[in-house]
Amino acid sequence: MRETDLADELFGQPGKTALPAGVRVATARQGGVTITRVEIAREGLARPRGRYVTLEVPSVSLLDERDSAVIEAAAAELRPLLPPEGPVLVLGVGNRRVTADALGPRTVQKVFVTMGPRTAPVPGIRPVAAVAPGVSAATGLSLQQLAGALVRELHPAALLCVDSLCSAEPERLGRTLQFSDTGLHPAQPDHSRHLDAARLGVPVLAAGIPTLMQAEEGRDLVVTPRDLDGVIAHGAALLGAAINRALQPKLSVAQLCWLVG
């Protein structure tokens, strides 16, 4: 099987293979969104123990932050994975200069930031900070080093990482959102990009959209959606709006879109 970051591609294929012990999969439909929840209750499987949620939507290049039904569905799945209160740091992982890898940096530009050195707490508004740390080739620091320094300085209740994902199936490209509470564990074997609670000392969540897949198993070639620019632009807006709605439930989608601009 080709590399994949999507848990439901590994465990959510009903009728193809029996589920391993300790894995539960449930699927539901909400409007035009198909939601698959994968819960892994033990270690030693293809993915770390924890909860994974994927939402299958029409191509995100056709959606944006005005699609409130999709945003509400995504926010409703992300919110239970977050701590109920406390500041959250949103980390945009990836290289903004490479389109397929730019989802994280582009998404943090859409996050409603409420923290700042001269910003007083506002009742009912959750403290949120957002940063895109760049790539190690440009900074000289690994993602783990940068994330660790930020966590030690800000003491967030949780770290939410946004990254471009890899899919094993072409029809999933630009059509799937995934959230998890297991940390950031890319399919590629670069462990300096792995972020989780054991390494950082705070809960680490991950969010993303698949933007590429291996062309052939074992070969260093990738396939991206034809409308990759649209997937990144609209996907970042959609993810940003869902993150904002999950973090700020007292504000409507319309209010949050106006505040972000």
Predicted feature residues:
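A glycine- and small-aliphatic-rich helix-loop capping segment at beta-alpha/alpha-beta transitions
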Residues: E77, T99-G116, T176-H185
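N-terminal amphipathic/basic leader segments beginning at the initiator methionine
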Residues: M1-G50
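Long, charge-dense
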Residues: R106-T139
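Short glycine-rich or small-residue beta-strand-to-loop segments that form or flank ligand, phosphate
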Residues: E56-P58, P87-V98, A130-G134
